[in-house]
Amino acid sequence: MNFRIWSPLLCVLVLISAAPASAQRQVIHEERSQYRNVLVTEFNGQRCMLFNIHRGDMNQTCIDLRNPKRLVFNYTKMSFAGLLLNPEPERILVAGLGGGTIPMVMRELYPEAEIDVLEVDQAVVNVAREFFGYQE
């Protein structure tokens, strides 16, 4: 394989995949909290929460609008790996709510478990409820 041919193509693909979350997205909600700007955007069938769009921050939470229960990010899927060690948890702690996708899926998988969520920013909780269907 000729590295000279593939090198520029690889660079372009990396740059495209690292594009800021704000590229070509429609902002449907924006509010200033005590800690940061909280934004909700929609693009290509996904609704996402992000912070500080002007700094180029990436998405914190995304849901697939066609299938809201599907976990979009690999890291959210990997957060369930610990359950291999304890397949029937009685108590679960989630640090940081985001859009609430992790605790909502946990609630569906483990309806008997006590799930505690730590979130310091009330604006994030409000946005999770209004735009991501989060229910405590």
Question: How would you label these PLM feature ranges?
Answer:
Residues A21-M49:
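N-terminal auxiliary segments of SAM/dcSAM-dependent transferases
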Residues R36-L39, R47, F51, K69, ...:
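N-terminal, helix-rich and Lys/Arg-enriched segments in bacterial and organellar proteins
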Residues R25, R70-E136:
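The AdoMet/dcAdoMet-binding core of the Class I SAM-like
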Residues L15, R32, T41, N86, ...:
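A generic structural signal for short, solvent-exposed coil/turn residues
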Residues P8-S17:
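Bacterial N-terminal signal peptides
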Residues M1, A19-S22:
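Intrinsic disorder/low-complexity segments
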Residues N44-N74:
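N-terminal, post-signal-peptide region of Sec/Tat-exported proteins
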Residues M1-P8:
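Bacterial N-terminal signal peptides that target proteins for export
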